[in-house]
Curated annotation (Swiss-Prot):
It is found in: Membrane. This is Protein COS8. Keywords: Membrane, Transmembrane, Transmembrane helix. The gene is COS8. The chain crosses the membrane at residues 43-63, 73-93, 238-258. InterPro entries: DUP/COS. It comes from Saccharomyces cerevisiae (strain ATCC 204508 / S288c). It is a multi-pass membrane protein. Belongs to the DUP/COS family. Coiled coil: none annotated. It holds the Pfam family DUP.
Length: 381
């Protein structure tokens, strides 16, 4: 009987611990219907929104007291249309300022919880920071980070990338002041965890080698590279553009021959550039895809052009099997694969400031250098 009671007590303790752990990791994504409703709630709770709403009180009094309705109307329209814009800007700046005040606590959470590159590992960090910010009156709600991914993104854009781009200690101290030692410790913990991921990834990769039978590069299937590019960029999304082009041709007659010629040329270059960027966006959806690309480059035994051809074949098969790309034609040939590496990976090592439209992939810098060394590329000037 006593043994059963002891077992029951233990099971209750385990259940209560799990419940506490679950409660600890509840995030706004579990509370709100979607990110839009969370965003609207945050705006509604902000001081800027309340000030904007209070502005309507003196405006309504002005409307009643003024004999001329034109001036109140103009001011009301300005407040109506420009007000939301300023509210959004002020809220964004407030979030940035609040986070910058708690960099030390941010670093402590990372050092303690040791999250990896997997967004799910950031759930505890996000939940703890949400509670800490609210309890210490850094933020006026319990929902600063919507989910783990937003917390991970904040870490990269606020700490990892800006700090890694600072090459000398004086620049780091000037930007981050007393937070420098805490940031260094947090980045070391994160880098060590990522290195373990990299080694585990390579071990698993060795256990499941590529099946390269019956793989041919697009250069062997298409007569010209231009044909391959045209097949990629001309699809239903381009249909409105070309309908617009034919409309211009029909309405302009013979008056504007230059526009007739320039429009398709410009659109071709724009769509080609978008296609190249789209490939990187697709590859960046998961960290494992970028790790796979770099690992394939590092471990390729063939050298020169043949080596890049083999890398292109392996990546074409991998991305198709992982349903990242809808066919085995991600890279046209080895030269295209080499250009892609230089453009979207190797170039990151020479950047001096963060990119607003893409990640710097700081975690991958050591492996990008290793891949560059393995392919015997010339160093950037």
């Amino acid at each position: 009987m006593k043994e059963n009671e002891v077992k029951d007590e233990k099971s209750v303790d385990v259940l209560s611990f799990k419940q506490l752990e679950f409660q600890k990791t509840v995030l706004p994504q579990d509370v709100f219907r979607n990110e839009l409703t969370w965003f609207c709630y945050e705006i509604y709770k902000s001081l800027a929104f309340r000030i904007w709403m209070l502005l309507w009180l003196p405006l309504s009094v002005w409307w009643k007291l003024s004999s001329n309705w034109i001036h109140p109307l103009i001011v009301s329209l300005l407040v109506l249309f420009l007000g939301p814009f300023f509210v959004l800007v002020i809220c964004g700046l407030s979030r940035k300022r609040s986070l910058s005040k708690q960099l030390i606590q941010f670093c402590k959470e990372i050092t303690e919880d040791t999250p990896s590159s997997d967004p799910h590992d950031w759930e505890v960090v996000a939940a703890n920071l949400n509670s800490y910010f609210y309890e210490n009156k850094t933020w006026n709600t319990k929902y600063f980070f919507f989910n783990a991914m937003s917390c991970q993104k904040a870490f990269k854009t606020t700490l990892l990338e800006p700090f890694s781009l600072k090459k000398d200690e004086s620049a780091k101290v000037k930007s981050f002041k007393d937070s420098v030692p805490y940031i260094e410790e947090a980045l070391q913990v994160y880098a060590a965890g990522f290195d373990k991921e990299w080694k585990l990834f390579n071990t698993e990769k060795e256990e499941s080698p590529f099946d390269l039978e019956d793989i041919q590069l697009p250069k062997e299937a298409y007569r010209f590279k231009l044909t391959w590019i045209l097949k990629r960029i001309f699809n239903l999304r381009c249909l409105p553009l070309f309908l617009y082009y034919f409309l211009i041709v029909y309405t302009s007659g013979n008056a504007d021959l230059i526009s007739r010629f320039l429009f398709p040329v410009v659109m071709f270059f724009i769509m080609t550039r978008d296609f190249q960027n789209m490939r990187m966006i697709v590859l960046s959806v998961k960290m494992e895809h970028k790790m796979q690309f770099l690992s394939t480059i590092i471990n390729e035994q063939e050298s020169g052009a043949n080596g890049w051809d083999e890398i292109a074949k392996k990546m074409n098969r991998y991305l198709f099997e992982k349903k990242v790309w809808n066919n085995e034609e991600f890279f046209y040939d080895g030269l295209d694969c080499e250009w892609f590496f230089r453009r979207f990976f190797y170039r990151l090592l020479s950047l001096k400031k963060p990119m607003w439209f893409a990640s710097l992939n700081v975690e991958l810098w050591p492996y990008i250098k290793e891949a560059q060394s393995a392919r015997n590329e010339k160093p950037l000037k």
